[in-house]
Each structure stands twice: as structure tokens, then as C-alpha cells.
């Protein structure tokens, strides 16, 4: 990196093209570190955490339609039927006790490890109304939410209404976290990522210009991976051959 920077800075034209690449990358990684925990916990604790979040999240389009006076009856009907179609497959393997425990523990970790200024408003409600007791909060969610059982979910979908959905504690928790993240973290992360990509492209272009005879492998995450050696026949078990 020092060699590259010296090479870029030694020529005015190169400095204009490549001089800011490494300092820009350094700054973008420093900026991204501020959001590393919130992004990780959003992905792992919310998006891939308790299954009740997934069902609530998938109901957002219906919630928007229910709240809008512009929604046509046929559009609303189609969304309701789509939501109903998720019921059987989801609740067939849904274990409420396990999901409730997962819900409480992951929210507790989110609250503990993500910086407080990146907490959604629902965490303030848990701190005040539930005295920071995530198990108590989880019990309230799973005892009352329409997403906690097939019976409650199907009953709601038989006569859906916006007010009931907006008051649902499971739905409110999901909306509070995802909306706050979108407004306060996701846009910043996207902007930093774009900046990071811009500087990385400049850095790679500069490296290729600095070392014209060197071969660079493409990014293995976006292209076919390089492989070495020989591909041979494979017999995983008796009677099976690849």
C-alpha cells in the first residue's frame, strides 16, 4: 500500500486518478465500523432470528394496503389471499415455545451489544413498561400477537383491519426495529458502501496500471472461482458415480 501510494503521488495525473483511493478506503472502513454491530444484529437477530418476525415482515404490504384509502378491493383481496396462503406451511413446523425463547434472547443481545443511539423506540418501551425484562416482553408478544399461532393468524385474515394490525405487539416490534434501521442505518451503510466501491475500483485500476505485467484474479465472490489441480471421477457411494 505504501508503494502504491508513493507511485500514485509521484505523478500529478496519477495522483488525480488514484491518490485518494487508499485514504478513501481507510475512511470508508472506519465509517462502516460504526454500523457493524447494528447491521450484523439486524441480519442475524431480526431477519434470520425468531420466525414471528418473518411472518410480521411479510405482512407489511398488506398492512400498507389496509391503511391506504387508495387500495382497490381486488388488490386488497389478492394480498389477503397471498397472506392466507402462507399460514399452513409456516405454522406446520412453528414451535411457539422455542420461538419465544429465541425472540427474547436475541432482542436482549441486540439491546446489550448495539450502541444505544442505534436502538429502535421499542427498546425504550421494553425498558420502561417491562423494566428491561425481555422474557416478560416476549411472553406478552406471544400471548397476544396474531402471528403467534395459526388460529390467531387465520382469524385475523378472515377479517383483517388496519387498527388491529398496527396495535399488534409482534407487528409493532418488527416495524419499530426495521423502520428505525432503514431511516438511521441502512441509508448510511449504502452510502458508505458506494463510496467504498468507488475507491476500490480506483485502487484496482491503479494496481493494474502500476503492474501491467501482473495477472490479477477476479473477485471470487462475484465470478467463477479459480481452481488448481485436476478434476477426477468421484464415487461417493456404491453405485453412484460422478
What are these regions (language model features)?
Residues 1-242:
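Terminal presequence/propeptide segments associated with secretion/organelle targeting
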Amino acid at each position: 500500500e505504501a508503494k502504491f501510494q508513493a507511485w500514485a503521488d509521484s505523478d500529478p495525473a496519477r495522483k488525480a486518478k488514484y491518490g485518494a483511493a487508499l485514504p478513501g478506503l481507510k475512511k470508508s472502513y472506519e465509517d462502516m465500523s460504526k454500523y457493524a454491530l447494528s447491521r450484523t444484529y439486524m441480519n442475524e437477530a431480526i431477519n434470520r432470528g425468531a420466525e414471528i418476525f418473518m411472518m410480521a415482515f411479510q405482512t407489511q404490504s398488506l398492512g400498507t394496503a389496509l391503511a391506504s384509502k387508495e387500495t382497490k378491493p381486488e388488490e386488497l383481496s389478492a394480498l389477503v389471499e397471498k397472506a392466507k396462503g402462507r399460514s399452513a406451511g409456516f405454522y406446520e413446523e412453528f414451535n411457539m415455545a422455542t420461538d419465544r425463547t429465541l425472540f427474547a434472547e436475541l432482542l436482549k443481545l441486540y439491546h446489550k451489544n448495539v450502541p444505544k443511539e442505534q436502538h429502535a423506540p421499542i427498546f425504550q418501551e421494553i425498558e420502561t413498561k417491562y423494566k428491561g425484562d425481555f422474557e416478560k416482553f416476549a411472553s406478552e408478544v406471544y400471548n397476544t400477537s396474531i402471528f403467534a399461532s395459526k388460529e390467531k393468524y387465520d382469524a385475523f385474515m378472515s377479517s383483517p383491519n388496519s387498527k388491529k394490525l398496527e396495535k399488534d405487539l409482534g407487528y409493532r416490534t418488527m416495524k419499530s426495529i426495521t423502520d428505525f434501521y432503514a431511516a438511521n442505518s441502512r441509508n448510511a451503510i449504502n452510502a458508505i458502501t458506494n463510496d467504498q466501491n468507488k475507491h476500490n475500483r480506483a485502487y484496482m485500476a491503479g494496481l493494474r496500471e502500476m503492474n501491467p505485467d501482473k495477472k490479477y484474479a477476479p473477485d471470487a465472490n462475484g465470478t467463477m472461482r479459480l481452481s488448481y489441480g485436476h478434476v477426477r471421477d468421484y464415487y461417493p457411494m456404491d453405485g453412484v458415480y460422478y
